[in-house]
Amino acid sequence: MQKRLTLLGSTGSIGDSTLDVVARHPDRFFVYALTAHRNGDKLVEQCLRFQPEVAVVGDADTAAKVAAKLRAAGCKTAVAYGPQALVDVSKSDGCDTVVAAIVGAAGLEPSLAAARAGKRILLANKEALVMSGSIFMDAVHDNGAILLPVDSEHNAIFQCLPRESALHGGVSKIILTASGGPFRTREPASLVDVTPDEACKHPNWVMGRKISVDSATMMNKGLEVIEAHWLFNLPGDRIDVLIHPQSVIHSLVSYADGSVLAQLGNPDMRTPIAHALAFPDRVDSGVGQLDLAQIAQLSFEKPDYTRFPCLALAMKALAEGGVASAALNAANEIAVEAFLTRRIGFMAIAQVVDAVLNSLPNREATSLADVVDADAAARRAAHAYIDGLPAGARLTERAVQ
């Protein structure tokens, strides 16, 4: 039987890779809905190719333009817009599988709607778990949803863990690998001069601009530690980060008997996407086989928290609990956007996040409203802090010494 997919964030990097895998297996997958924010032209191209029943965009103007182009091409895809439309296609009876690939906090509510509707969820939107934590996981468990991680690291951990959760007691710790990004060996003092284009040039992975910056600051790895805590029900002190520049080993699980299991593969997101789409089966992803002899050498090192203060901030937020992780994520989104638009320098990203975490009171997250309120407060605080920075400080100051 074909799986019927809603793809949230189809025009982004994960969306592209997902559709590449889907196109290789038309007998297995049917695209029910595609969603984008404002990239209407690309969404039209995708709709003409995959003929979904529904397309969703962020606003009425984009919806009108997309609908007109689809009608002119004879495509019968219905077009909707706005946050509620995202929720609707995520919980619709028209799909059984939701690929959650919207970047940032905007992906939380549709992902949560999919969980409450008992869908099979392929989670690429780590922010959903970072922000809502137990609220999201409770929705998954209470409604019989199936949660499959798409992030390469978490997908690797999932593959290395025993299928039966009762056997997870033999797990000693999990180890998330990180490439170290484009600035792993760069002199720390020179990081104040980093440009957005430099930060977006990842040495191994093809990603969108926001996640590329997060990789460069290693905030992405920090968010992944928080995500792993919720996905695999392990405390932060049993989740390690290991720098692995080649991005061949995607993560590892260490067991009580001294065994360590690892998942390896070429650095291409189509591999974890194909695994999650077809699970428990295996299908062709379009990714070439790994040639270890050609790679010849794999290297590892501990993360440098002085060079990567954002990683330390994420660890701090996880330890504090409550809404701290939601505030961390929100402040980081605002700071990264300010960096990409050249309002602040690269090293000021961590400064903004640290200031927001220190300025806002923490509290327990007992409802989605608590999470949304913390997110909004952190965004306001981040904007205010950036607006109050002297021009020089915006470029040079560091957050964590």
From Swiss-Prot:
It catalyses: 2-C-methyl-D-erythritol 4-phosphate + NADP(+) = 1-deoxy-D-xylulose 5-phosphate + NADPH + H(+). Its cofactor is Mg(2+); Mn(2+). Catalyzes the NADPH-dependent rearrangement and reduction of 1-deoxy-D-xylulose-5-phosphate (DXP) to 2-C-methyl-D-erythritol 4-phosphate (MEP). One of its GO terms (biological process) is isopentenyl diphosphate biosynthetic process, methylerythritol 4-phosphate pathway involved in terpenoid biosynthetic process. It holds the Pfam family DXP_redisom_C. 1-deoxy-D-xylulose 5-phosphate binds at residues 126, 152-153, 179, 202, 215, 220-221, 224. InterPro entries: DXP_reductoisomerase, DXP_reductoisomerase_C, DXP_reductoisomerase_N, DXPR_C, DXPR_C_sf, NAD(P)-bd_dom_sf. Signal peptide: none annotated. Keywords: Isoprene biosynthesis, Manganese, Metal-binding, NADP, Oxidoreductase. Its EC number is 1.1.1.267. Pathway: Isoprenoid biosynthesis; isopentenyl diphosphate biosynthesis via DXP pathway; isopentenyl diphosphate from 1-deoxy-D-xylulose 5-phosphate: step 1/6. PANTHER family: 1-DEOXY-D-XYLULOSE 5-PHOSPHATE REDUCTOISOMERASE, 1-DEOXY-D-XYLULOSE 5-PHOSPHATE REDUCTOISOMERASE, CHLOROPLASTIC. GO terms for molecular function: 1-deoxy-D-xylulose-5-phosphate reductoisomerase activity; manganese ion binding; NADPH binding. Mn(2+) binds at residues 151, 153, 224. It comes from the Bacteria. NADPH binds at residues 11-14, 38-39, 125, 127, 208. Belongs to the DXR family. It is an enzyme of class 1 (oxidoreductase). It comes from Paraburkholderia phymatum (strain DSM 17167 / CIP 108236 / LMG 21445 / STM815). This is 1-deoxy-D-xylulose 5-phosphate reductoisomerase.
